């Protein structure tokens, strides 16, 4: 399974949480300390919990299960699409359409409509004989559907796992998954509720580098899991035991790094880091604000 190091997490700014006035008390056990009004996430726990989550995703992928990558905030959109495509999985990176999971039949009708419009547009003369205004309307409809559904149009039914960037922003997706018993793996910042997530990965869910790091590692877990599935006499235990020496060494370091040493390098990192942004701004490197939410193209109550 993919390895991840303390150095990678520090360089990506994974340890920067939200302002101390914006936090969820349930995240207390994952907090290392506080610096200049910003909570610092305990990367020791992030390392271990990422390893557990990645192993779970790899096991599911090895069993032929499908993973849906979800990240609609602006700084997550590109990484989510790229990594999901790389591991041949599915994604939602624009809008989470209400009822996407709980009213899948309705969403599939929209997907069917998208494929009809794509087929029409791909054939020369597909719009022949139609008024110009109608052609413009159909193209507008096709582009709108493609923007919202392109990442799931080939998904064969409900996903088996959700990988989520920011469980707060994607709260509707998390609730729908929980209602259907679909496991949720999520990057959970200091302002989130970890009880809503099955596999918690404590970390910065706003920094571009942190998002890309986690998305790429989860995609690696899917790729490696699928590769193991092709081996003869595969068992779930083999995922745990069949690691290359290099990977095994890294995972040993990841899980058993001395707590005092971990605290030391985190403290050194913080002392050398630049001062956090003023309280009115978000923390950490490469942070961006989320895009304003617009009304979804498909609206279902999710009942």
From Swiss-Prot:
Give the span(s) annotated as Disordered.
267-303
Q: Which GO terms describe its molecular function?
A: structural constituent of ribosome
Give the intrachain disulfide bonds. none
Positions in coiled-coil regions: none
For this UniProt record, the keywords arranged alphabetically read as follows: Ribonucleoprotein, Ribosomal protein
The record's similarity note reads: Belongs to the universal ribosomal protein uS2 family.
The record's annotation in NCBIfam families points to: rpsB_bact
- PANTHER family assigned: 30S RIBOSOMAL PROTEIN S2 PROKARYOTIC AND ORGANELLAR, SMALL RIBOSOMAL SUBUNIT PROTEIN US2M
Indicate what this protein is called per its UniProt record. Answer: Small ribosomal subunit protein uS2
What species is given as this protein's source?
Solibacter usitatus (strain Ellin6076)
């Amino acid at each position: 399974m993919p390895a991840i190091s303390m150095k990678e997490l520090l360089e990506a700014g994974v340890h920067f949480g939200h302002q101390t006035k914006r936090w969820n008390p349930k995240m207390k056990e994952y907090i290392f300390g506080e610096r200049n009004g910003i909570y610092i996430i305990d990367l020791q726990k992030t390392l271990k919990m990422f390893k557990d989550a990645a192993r779970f995703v790899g096991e599911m992928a090895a069993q032929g299960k499908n993973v849906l990558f979800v990240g609609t905030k602006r700084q997550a959109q590109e990484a989510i699409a790229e990594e999901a495509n790389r591991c041949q999985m599915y994604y939602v990176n624009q809008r989470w359409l209400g009822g996407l999971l709980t009213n899948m039949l309705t969403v599939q009708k929209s997907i069917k409509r998208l494929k009809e419009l794509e087929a029409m547009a791909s054939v020369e003369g597909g719009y022949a004989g139609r008024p110009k205004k109608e052609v413009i309307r159909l193209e507008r409809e096709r582009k709108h559907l493609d923007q919202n559904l392109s990442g799931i149009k080939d998904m064969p039914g409900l996903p088996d796992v959700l990988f989520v960037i920011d469980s707060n922003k994607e709260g509707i997706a998390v609730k729908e998954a929980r209602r259907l018993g679909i496991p949720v793996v999520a990057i959970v910042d200091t302002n989130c509720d970890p009880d809503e997530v099955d596999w918690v990965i404590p970390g910065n869910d706003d920094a571009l580098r942190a998002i890309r790091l986690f998305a790429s590692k989860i995609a690696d877990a899917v790729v490696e899991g699928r590769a193991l599935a092709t081996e003869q006499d595969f068992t779930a235990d083999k995922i745990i035991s069949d690691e290359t020496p290099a990977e095994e060494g890294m995972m040993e370091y990841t899980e058993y790094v001395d707590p005092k040493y971990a605290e030391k390098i985190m403290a050194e990192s913080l002392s050398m880091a630049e001062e956090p942004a003023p309280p009115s701004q978000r923390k950490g490197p490469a942070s961006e604000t989320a895009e304003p939410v617009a009304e979804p193209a498909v609206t279902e109550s999710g009942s």
